Swiss-Prot record:
Lineage: superkingdom: Bacteria
Alphabetical list of PROSITE patterns matching this protein: PROKAR_LIPOPROTEIN
Record-linked Pfam families: DUF576 (PF04507)
Membrane topology value: Lipid-anchor
Keywords: Cell membrane, Lipoprotein, Membrane, Palmitate, Signal
Covalent lipidation (N-palmitoyl cysteine), chain numbering: C20
Organism: Staphylococcus epidermidis (strain ATCC 35984 / DSM 28319 / BCRC 17069 / CCUG 31568 / BM 3577 / RP62A)
Protein name according to UniProt: Uncharacterized lipoprotein SERP2443
Length: 253
């Protein structure tokens, strides 16, 4: 299902991709630099003092809210898709952080149609520690939540400039843009993901940097990363991550 959706999107962009050369690739990298420069931020409380991109969407008194999220999704061949991840809303006005850990499973309903079953577990962050705010049904899940680390805490993109020959797409009408790179299993970030997750394939991933909004900067729109290990009709394994700065009144709606 996810595979077919992405194929449709890529086909619709084929006409727009042509003509995107090294200049556009450089522009996309520069657009992502401010976000990727935050990797790694080991202490999440450092976000209370980090400034983000501000425009007319922000109230002058609003210091803004950072949203960080990381999710691993695995769909083994012949089995259902399962996603496990966490989102935090780091409010710079109140210097408080809350969010949720979630588990989403794709299953069949009584009529054989695919449906998503998602369970959320509310959390808060204090002294760089994740704390569940409601009782957790089992100790294993509780430890999984308490020990969770966001990719922004350990990822590192200091060698982004060395990524070459990316598959570049740009649609000025949306606007949206992306750059995709084939990585090796020796890549630092790939090693870090394999260290933290049980990834059931030796296949090296592709890194996709994707965003929407003005390439020159805007608080409207979003940027995200995706490490895709396997993507086809029968099997999907990918890790997604994002860091976004938003007006506080809109960040938790």
């Amino acid at each position: 299902m996810r595979y077919l959706k992405k194929v449709t999107i890529y086909i619709s962009l084929l006409i727009l991709v042509s003509g995107c050369g090294n200049g556009k690739e450089t522009e996309i990298k520069q657009n992502f630099n401010k976000m990727l420069d935050m990797y790694p931020t080991k202490n999440l409380e450092d976000f209370y003092d980090k400034e983000g991109y501000r425009d007319e969407e922000f109230d002058k008194k609003d210091k803004g809210t950072w949203i960080v999220g990381s999710t691993m999704t695995i769909e083994p061949k012949g089995k259902y898709m399962e996603s496990r991840g966490m989102f935090l809303y780091i409010n710079r006005n109140t210097r408080t952080t809350k969010g949720y850990y979630y588990v989403r499973k794709t299953t069949d309903d009584s009529k054989g149609r695919l449906k998503d079953d998602e369970k959320r577990y509310p959390v808060k962050m204090e002294h760089n520690k994740i704390i569940p705010t409601k009782p957790i049904p089992n100790d294993k899940l509780k430890k999984e939540i308490e020990n969770f680390k966001f990719f922004v805490q350990y990822g590192d993109f200091k060698n982004l400039k060395d990524y070459k020959d990316g598959d570049i797409s740009y649609n000025p009408n949306v606007p949206s843009y992306s750059a995709k790179y084939q990585l090796s299993n020796n890549d630092y970030n790939v090693k870090q993901l394999r260290k933290r997750y049980d990834i059931p394939t030796n296949q090296a991933p592709k890194l996709l940097l994707k965003g929407d909004g003005d390439l020159k900067g805007s608080s409207i729109g979003s940027k995200s990363l995706e490490f895709t290990f396997i993507e086809n009709k029968e099997e999907n394994i990918f890790f997604s991550d994002g860091v976004q700065f938003t007006p506080s009144e809109d960040s938790e709606s």
